[in-house]
């Protein structure tokens, strides 16, 4: 038998064998199950990828917030580092102002000393002002409980109620933050 005859005989044998549909169906079913399994794995991997991406985005946002808060804390620390020192200087400023206020300006012998105290006060006010320490002088302004401390209330028909009519002690703020409220007398409507 030559090679051609063997091929023809093999083909006839293959054609003679009955093809059972269950074999094909089982192969298709197995392949479909494998495809479904792979699709499920792909979906799970995609879901895990999305979750990890969201987690990474949240971590980046959290780091940005942390960096921003740290920068704000450092800025506040620089801005208000002088708060205790400034609070200790307030009585000195008060005493210099009181000394000028109570000095006998008519006495010729005291005039050079009074001028010296005035210059010292101006110099000190200028120096502390450079660092953000500024006086609160609320005379004739509306009472603000955040910046003023009411020591008493006096009836006054000429001014609107809750207007500061006298300042007993100046208040001070450091870079916009009140470190000592002004002690004031406040008007109230006549009874």
Swiss-Prot record:
Biased composition (Basic and acidic residues): 1-10
Subunit structure: Homodimer.
Gene Ontology MF terms: adenyl-nucleotide exchange factor activity; protein homodimerization activity; protein-folding chaperone binding; unfolded protein binding
Disulfide bridge positions per record: none
Protein name, as recorded: Protein GrpE
Record's GO cellular component terms: cytosol
Pfam family, one: GrpE
Family designation: Belongs to the GrpE family.
Annotated keywords: Chaperone, Cytoplasm, Stress response
HAMAP family, per the entry: GrpE (MF_01151)
Keyword Transmembrane tagged: no
InterPro entries: GrpE (IPR000740), GrpE_coiled_coil (IPR013805), GrpE_head (IPR009012)
Cross-referenced NCBIfam families: PRK14139.1, PRK14140.1, PRK14150.1
Any Gene Ontology biological process: protein folding
Compartment list: Cytoplasm
UniProt-annotated stretches for the region Disordered: 1-28
């Amino acid at each position: 038998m030559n090679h051609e005859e063997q091929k023809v005989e093999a083909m006839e044998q293959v054609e003679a064998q009955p093809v059972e549909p269950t074999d094909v169906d089982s192969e298709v079913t197995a392949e479909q199950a494998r495809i479904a399994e792979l699709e499920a794995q792909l979906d799970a991997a995609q879901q895990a990828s999305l979750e990890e991406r969201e987690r990474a985005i949240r971590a980046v946002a959290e780091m940005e917030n942390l960096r921003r808060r740290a920068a704000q804390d450092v800025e506040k620390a620089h801005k208000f580092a002088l708060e205790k020192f400034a609070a200790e200087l307030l009585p000195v400023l008060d005493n210099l102002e009181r000394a000028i206020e109570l000095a006998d300006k008519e006495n010729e012998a005291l005039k050079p000393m009074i001028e010296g105290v005035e210059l010292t006060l101006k110099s000190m006010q200028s120096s502390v002002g450079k660092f953000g320490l500024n006086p609160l002088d609320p005379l004739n302004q509306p009472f603000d409980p955040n910046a003023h401390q009411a020591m008493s209330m006096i009836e006054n028909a000429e001014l609107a109620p809750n207007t500061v009519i006298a300042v007993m002690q100046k208040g001070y703020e450091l870079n916009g933050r009140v470190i000592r409220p002004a002690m004031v007398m406040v008007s109230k409507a006549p009874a």
